[in-house]
Structures are given as C-alpha cells and as structure tokens.
C-alpha cells in the first residue's frame, strides 16, 4: 500500500506527510480536495449541464436550470419511480404468495401429524374391576404429549451452518424498500414540481451581441434596474412576477420599500423574491463551500 520503504530518505518513522500522500495515491479513506475557480460554475449556468442557460428557469430555492434539462430530469425521475414501484409491488406479491404457501404447508403438516397420532391409538376393552391408574406402561419410554404442539427447544437453538445440508441458510433476494413517489430537486433534495419553476429573464449588457458572442464574454448580464454588471461576486435575486434578475443591494434599498415589481408593477411578497444560488468566486470568503469530499473504503489493520 505504501512506499515508505522505497523512498531514498526513508526513516524509522512513518510521517504524516507520507501517510497523506500514500492515502491519496492508494484511493483508500476519505479523499479531500480544495476546489479552485475552474471547478466553480458561473451564476447563469445550469446546475445539471453546467452550461450557460438559453431558456433558464429557477426553483423556489434559487437553483438555476435549463428548462429542457430539468424537464427531462423530472420525466426521467417519474419513469424511475414507476419502475421501482412496479418492482416493489411484484416482490410484495411474491412474498404474500410465499407466506400463503408456508401457511398451507404448515396446516397440512398439522393435519398429517394429527392423523398419524390417531392411527397409532390402539383401542382396548375397559375392565371395570381395574382402577383407572393401572394402565399399561409406555413401551417406548416416552412421555405422552399433545398431537400438535410447538417445536422442541433443541430445534429452536439450531444455528445455520454452511457445511451441513440440512442447516444451510437460504439465499433470499434483497428486500426492496417502498419507494417515494415524490420527485426531488437534484441540488436541494426538496420536492419539485413543474409548476414550481419560474422563468428567468436576464438583461443583456449589450443587446446587439448574439448568443454565441455573449457566451465568450466574462460579463454578460446586468441588473434590470440599476444596470450593474452581474457576476459570481454579486448576490442576485429573481423577481417571480416578471422573472427579472436584480442585485440584492437593489432589493434591499429600492424594492423592499414599496414591494412592487419595478418591471411590470405587480405587488411583491417575500415568496416572490428568490435569492439566486451563485457559483462563488473561488475564494473562501465568497460564502460557497469549496471543499469536496468523497468517501472510499478504509483499510484497517
């Protein structure tokens, strides 16, 4: 696993640096990496395709998606849920049939045992001059017991064994849990419906630039009210009635005073102001988690 003995400066102590390096090289244990700016998506990119959105929509939690991508995801989840429900119902029906078969077999065993006990009884004429306690001794030395009763204690303590054919455990199929019928958001994990999606309209910095030329620019969109440039360093919000994207500074200083959408004049509520989840700038102070972890098997002595 390690290369401690192969290093030219190998010492008697396995250092912490060597342990971390060998852990990263071997793939065992939890792997950690600090994400750089190249690994952070832009604020106007889809959370599924990681590409700039052509027809963007936003969820109530502020996650931006391409309409085609999120609708395809929802349809895929519904088909997957239908498949899981079908498999669950099939296994459930098979288990019911198995339980019924076991109950029928147990009932047949009880009837068979009762008939065998009844057939073994020998009728003898009663002698009125002999007391009832004077009966014939049991030739087999067994105590009389009920014809149908619980299994003996020695049978209860029988453990499964792989080398005795009669005690070999049965290989059973994995029990399926009842699947949830709710489609969830791929980012937040909360329930998501098509009616919860809100269309987003970004205001372009230059209306004369086509879509291809717009993608190549670092600053593509501006605030719909203040015309400030939007980026990962600028907290943004989406107004639900109009779908316009504005800065949070504009929301706090201008929009919250009257709670009126400055684009179409509709009345706003707190639910209509959706804070957009931005990708971050790559700096630790941007408020975005930049530490990625992946759990791997652990090698223990």
Curated annotation (Swiss-Prot):
Gene Ontology MF terms: molecular sequestering activity; ubiquitin protein ligase activity
Location of the region described as U-box-like in the Swiss-Prot/TrEMBL record: 55-75
Intracellular or extracellular location(s): Cytoplasm; Nucleus
Pathway as given in its UniProt record: Protein modification; protein ubiquitination
EC numbers for this chain: 2.3.2.27
Main location per the UniProt record: cytoplasm
Motif (Nuclear localization signal): 78-101
Region (Disordered) residue spans: 131-154
Annotated catalysed reactions: S-ubiquitinyl-[E2 ubiquitin-conjugating enzyme]-L-cysteine + [acceptor protein]-L-lysine = [E2 ubiquitin-conjugating enzyme]-L-cysteine + N(6)-ubiquitinyl-[acceptor protein]-L-lysine
Record PTM Phosphoserine, positions in chain: 36
GO biological processes: protein ubiquitination; regulation of nitric oxide biosynthetic process
Calcium keyword on record: no
Annotated keywords: Cytoplasm, Developmental protein, Nucleus, Phosphoprotein, Transferase, Ubl conjugation pathway
Subunit text: Interacts with NOS1 and NOS3. Interacts with PP2A holoenzyme, containing PPP2CA, PPP2CB, PPP2R1A and PPP2R2A subunits.
Free-text comment on this protein's domains from its UniProt entry: The U-box-like region is a truncated U-box domain. It is unknown whether it is functional or not.
Family to which this protein belongs: Belongs to the NOSIP family.
Name of this protein: Nitric oxide synthase-interacting protein
Gene name, Swiss-Prot/TrEMBL: Nosip
């Amino acid at each position: 696993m390690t290369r401690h003995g192969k290093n030219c400066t190998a010492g008697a102590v396995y250092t912490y640096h060597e342990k971390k390096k060998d852990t990263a090289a071997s793939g065992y244990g939890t792997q950690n990496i600090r994400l750089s700016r190249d690994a952070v998506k832009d604020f106007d990119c889809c959370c599924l395709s990681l590409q700039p959105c052509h027809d963007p929509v936003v969820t109530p939690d502020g996650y931006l998606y391409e309409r085609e991508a999120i609708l395809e995801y929802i349809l895929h989840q519904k088909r997957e849920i239908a498949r899981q429900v079908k498999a669950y119902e099939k296994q459930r029906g098979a288990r019911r049939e198995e339980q019924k078969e076991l109950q029928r077999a147990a009932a047949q065993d009880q009837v068979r045992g009762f008939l065998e006990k009844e057939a073994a009884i020998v009728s003898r004429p009663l002698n009125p001059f002999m007391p009832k306690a004077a009966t014939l001794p049991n030739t087999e030395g067994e105590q009389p017991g009920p014809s149908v009763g619980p299994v003996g204690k020695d049978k209860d303590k029988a453990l499964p064994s792989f080398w005795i054919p009669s005690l070999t455990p049965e290989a059973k199929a994995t029990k399926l849990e009842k699947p949830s019928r709710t489609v969830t958001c791929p980012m937040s994990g909360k329930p998501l419906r098509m009616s919860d999606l809100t269309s987003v309209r970004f205001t372009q910095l230059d209306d004369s630039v086509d879509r291809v030329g717009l993608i190549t620019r670092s600053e593509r969109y501006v605030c719909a009210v203040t015309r400030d440039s939007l980026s990962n360093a600028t907290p943004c919000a989406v107004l639900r009635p109009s779908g316009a994207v504005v800065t949070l500074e504009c929301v706090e200083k201008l929009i919250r005073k009257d709670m009126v959408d400055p684009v179409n004049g509709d009345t706003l509520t707190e639910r209509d102001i959706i804070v957009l989840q931005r990708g971050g700038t790559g700096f630790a102070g941007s408020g975005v988690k930049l530490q990625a972890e992946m759990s791997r098997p652990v090698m223990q002595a």
